[in-house]
């Protein structure tokens, strides 16, 4: 196993695009992320498939790392909205994955996610995982919660998604 990452074409770079011709770069690409942690460089050196989640206080960029097997994970970069996003120093990389094979029992290799906002303003995480270590890739959808620090929480199980005391609702209706 190699321990020093080698760029094989699947690291995260950012550059400014020409607004009139968005297929043309008008700045040099800058490296935002490479697989520098053990959880990110299993079998291959990949940081790929970035997707932005923008809130009032932070810009989050999730990405997938490792091989597309049970080691596949979702990592996180964050930056302040007013920061120079082309400056790599503006981005903070978390040293742990937000989703992994340990996030939910029976779900392996969770990765390559995106976000959807529904008509009620709830944010949902769409991703793929495997029902078994060697199972086929399957789609998953889970509600995104935000911690007290404003960061997304992607690994809540169904049991933790809603407090048990809130699962049953009753009311009295008075008709006059």
Question: Each PLM stretch: what is its role?
Answer:
Residues 1-176:
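Carbohydrate-active catalytic/glycan-binding domains of CAZyme proteins
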């Amino acid at each position: 196993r190699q321990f020093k990452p080698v760029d094989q074409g699947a690291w995260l770079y950012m550059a400014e695009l020409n607004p009139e011709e968005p297929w043309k770069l008008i700045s040099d690409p800058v490296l935002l992320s490479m697989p520098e942690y053990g959880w990110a460089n299993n079998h291959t050196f990949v940081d790929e498939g970035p997707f932005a989640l923008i809130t009032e206080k932070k810009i989050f960029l999730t990405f997938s790392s490792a091989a597309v097997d049970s080691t596949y994970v979702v990592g996180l970069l964050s930056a302040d909205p007013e920061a120079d996003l082309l400056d790599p120093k503006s981005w903070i990389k978390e040293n742990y994955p937000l989703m992994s094979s340990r996030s939910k029992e029976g779900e392996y290799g969770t990765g390559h996610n995106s976000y959807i906002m529904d008509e009620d303003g709830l944010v949902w995480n769409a991703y793929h995982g495997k029902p078994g270590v060697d199972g086929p890739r399957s789609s998953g959808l889970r509600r995104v919660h935000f911690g007290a620090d404003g960061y997304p929480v992607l690994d809540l199980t169904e049991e933790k998604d809603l407090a048990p005391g809130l699962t049953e609702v009753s009311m009295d209706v008075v008709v006059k």
